[in-house]
Every structure is written in C-alpha cells, then in structure tokens.
C-alpha cells in the first residue's frame, strides 16, 4: 500500500546546524550466526547514479541488529528489480528464506518514490510477505531506508524496529571557544547536528519518553546544574543547581518525573522531581553514595548504583519508600545500569579481573552475559526495542562510541573525526 512518509524530525532541522565531521559505523565483528537474508541493491529508475544506496542502508540496519546476516553483494545469485523477478530456488540453495528487493524512482517535482518488497524464498516461495512505498524529498531518502528496515525487521522477528531512532552524545572538540557540544544523530551516526555548545563540560544527556526534550548536566554557571532543553525551539529549563553535585538525570517512562542524583547534604543520593509541579522528594539517604538512576517500566521503581556494600553495585528501590535491594552479584563491581523497556533485563558496566566491559543481566534469573571486548567501557544505553546497545570506550588517548547487539553477535565502532565522544543516550521510538 502506498503511503506518504511522515517526517518525524522536520522540526529539528529548522534550527539545528548540520555538521560535516560525523560518526559512522565501522564494523569490528560480524554476524555469521545471524539469520541469513538477501538484500538486493534497489533498482534506480532515473538517470546517472542513484542519489542514495537504499538497499545498502537496509542491509546495514539488519546486520547492526545482530539478528541477521545479509549476504555479501558479491555472492548474490541474482539482482532482481522486482518481486516477480525473484527466483526462490537460487536463494534457498544458499540457505536464504527471505529476500528484500526495491525500487527508487525520481518524480518531476524533485521528490522520490521508494518502494520495497519482502519476498519469501523458503516456506511459500515467491510470496510477498510485506511491501510498502514512500514519497520523500532527497534529504529523507535515508529515513525511507530505515523505515523499510523497521518494517522488514518487525515482519521477520515480531519485534518493533528501532532504525529510525536517534542517539544523543557529548563531543569534546579540539579547542575553540565552545569545546563541548551536545549532539544528536541518526542511530548509525548520519545526519548529525548540534543541540548545544558550551565553554564548560556537558554530561549525561537523557531523552524524554516522547523524544521532544533532552535533560543533561552543564557546568556553564561555574558549578553543575541540571537542565531540560526542548529540541524544537531550544528553550532551556533549569531543574536543579544545588551546592555540590547535580547529575545523572533520567526521565520516567510515563514522562511525569525526572530522577537524578544530588550531594547537597553530603553523600550522593537519589531524588525525584514531579515535572508538572516542580516538587522534589528524596528517595535514598544514608552515608553511601547513590547515583546513576534508571527507571523500570512501571515508573515507580529505580535501578541505581550504590557503594552501600563497599564497591559499586546495582540496587533496586521503590520511589515511594522501602529499603533498596541489591540485584547484581557477579563481578567485583557493577554500575551505570540501563533497564530494558520490558523490564526483563538490564545492561551495565561490569568489572572483573581488572577488565571493565558492558554486560547484560537477566532480571529474572540473574544470569550475566558480557557483551563487549573494548577498553574501559562506560555509559551503556539500550535501543528502545532492546536489541542493541550504544556505549563509550577508550581508544588511544580519546574515547569513541561503540555499538553491540544484546545477543553479542555484532560489534561496531562509531568513531568521530573531530573530538572525544562520550555519554551516548539512545532515543525512544520517534
């Protein structure tokens, strides 16, 4: 069915400045154990070269999820331009039971039609499992590709795709009047733009659940402060600027509250603000340091880092009262957790034997799986569908962003060319 593509991010582009030095995915290890799939280069119906490699975008998205292993283009048994041209036997002979084909057609008004078809080459050979078409302007061709990826991914896995999401992160550039920048890009590093520039450090961006705002820490006043910035117009609301430390903001899933850490009474403790009234209440107390809150789906419970037992570990607490419960037991220390949107697992920074990596813990069984193999890994953030994690790690004298699938199959880097990159935060569905 033909439909016009709705541009979800148009309001951002009105005021944001697009950058040339972008972060882009560089593959570290592949997905040989993922489900084989064929993604054919989309047929271009215009003059010259196609303005965007839509088929390449779809293949990369499916690969990045860790759940698929797209066949290399050099090994494609054929390059059909339509569903009718797919020869199922040629694909099934290679163990491939689904193929994505597509078409890109220029329109007289300067726009483009992008269409795809997902074709069964296994159980019901030749059957079109999913198809769609979109009319977009040139700058939204990548978005059209991500849209096709989302639909193919959901059809084949039953999981909502997260390829049209974005990431926020902080870049410390190499000098200049404003060396600290809060940036946002597509999840794969493309279409990057600046949200805020500062002469002083910026830290810990966090998305509102509707994707319209970012909370973050700034030191522009001479001390730490928590602010919330509206992306559409740049308006900034100061949330907290108490003596000592103000940090680690986290919006509740229902959007009504903001959790954060303050040290105004000495030790770091967790607080929750009702965003409508501005009222703040303290959640933890005592001499231990409690920080890095992340919400459970019910918007009533927090996972957080505490040194209550000596070394940092992850605990759970209800914001309405009750004693914190420790939920991490493997490794010498665990911290900076991010709970999945379904509440079934969390990712965290786990240290053991002198190594600091990103790990995944099943919250029902307590089972832990180490996902990363990079150096000094920090600040993991989950995609809204729980299939991928973005995090930062040390590389040489700087820091870079890394992507790993939550099954550990796929690992990649998103290196920046103009500074150190830290504090990644994955957006909700947009």
From Swiss-Prot:
Sorted alphabetically, which InterPro entries does this protein's record hold? Answer: 6-blade_b-propeller_TolB-like (IPR011042), PD40 (IPR011659), Tol-Pal_TolB (IPR014167), TolB_N (IPR007195)
Xref: Pfam families: PD40, TolB_N
- Per the record's keyword annotation, is Ion transport included, yes or no? no
Location within or outside the cell: Periplasm
A single GO cellular-component term from the record reads:
periplasmic space
- Is Cell cycle one of the keywords UniProt gives this record? yes
Region forming the signal peptide:
1-21
Which superkingdom? Answer: Bacteria
Instruction: State how it assembles.
Output: The Tol-Pal system is composed of five core proteins: the inner membrane proteins TolA, TolQ and TolR, the periplasmic protein TolB and the outer membrane protein Pal. They form a network linking the inner and outer membranes and the peptidoglycan layer.
Protein's job: Part of the Tol-Pal system, which plays a role in outer membrane invagination during cell division and is important for maintaining outer membrane integrity. TolB occupies a key intermediary position in the Tol-Pal system because it communicates directly with both membrane-embedded components, Pal in the outer membrane and TolA in the inner membrane.
Q: What's the protein here called? A: Tol-Pal system protein TolB
